[in-house]
């Protein structure tokens, strides 16, 4: 933040440190717009954001040799929040081992490192767009308002073993393991319960 911006800040205004990881593909475009939103929030409310950008995904591989550079991870640890774009490029992902690809080496690692286990995905249909919905108008009722709560750090993402093996006669067998602990199930259930109480 420059000195002029610091002078304009009201006394006692809270500043939040944000790690902005634009990543690959549409990530940089989405990140530019997200930062514009944060700047608009600063103008409207007594809040300030110190935003530091860092490489992740193929941008990280190109800059530092890995999808989640050490400097990016350290920035995330020192920040109040992480603003994440997207990672992975279909034309480049197949060129490296699965474990080193951006989704696994960057996104899943960040989720695990910071216990980012709950993804809240709202589904809403404004009445102005009702005609675009595949559901007939009589089935839409008063509109659509759904919240999907998705668990991110257990299940098949991190379950082992996970492999494909030859079993002879031109056949292969794929093994993928779904693993959840009691506490992982309880915590995602409680996020869902709390969200339901607010609806």
Model-found features: residue ranges?
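Short N-terminal binding/cap micro-motifs at the start of the first secondary-structure element
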Residues: 26-31
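Alpha-helical scaffold elements adjacent to nucleotide-binding pockets in ATP/GTP-utilizing enzyme cores
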Residues: 33, 37, 106-109
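Short catalytic helix/loop segments, enriched in acidic residues and glycine
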Residues: 35-45
């Amino acid at each position: 933040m420059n000195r002029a911006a610091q002078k304009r800040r009201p006394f006692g205004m809270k500043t939040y440190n944000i790690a902005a990881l634009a990543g690959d593909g549409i990530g940089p475009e989405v990140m530019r717009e997200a930062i514009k939103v944060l700047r608009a929030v600063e103008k409207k409310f007594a809040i300030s954001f110190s935003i530091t950008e860092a490489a992740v995904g193929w941008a990280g591989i190109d800059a530092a040799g890995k999808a989640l550079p050490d400097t990016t991870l350290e920035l995330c640890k020192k920040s109040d929040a992480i603003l994440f774009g997207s990672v992975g490029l279909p034309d480049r992902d197949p060129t490296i081992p699965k474990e080193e690809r951006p989704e696994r080496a960057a996104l899943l690692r960040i989720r695990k490192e910071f216990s980012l286990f709950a993804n809240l995905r709202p589904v809403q249909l404004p009445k102005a767009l009702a005609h675009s919905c595949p559901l007939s108008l009589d089935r839409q009722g008063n509109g659509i308002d759904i919240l999907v709560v998705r668990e991110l750090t257990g299940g098949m993402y991190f379950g082992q073993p996970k492999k494909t093996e030859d079993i002879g006669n031109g056949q292969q067998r794929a093994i993928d393991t779904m693993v959840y602990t009691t506490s992982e199930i309880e915590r995602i259930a409680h996020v869902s319960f709390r969200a339901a109480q607010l609806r």
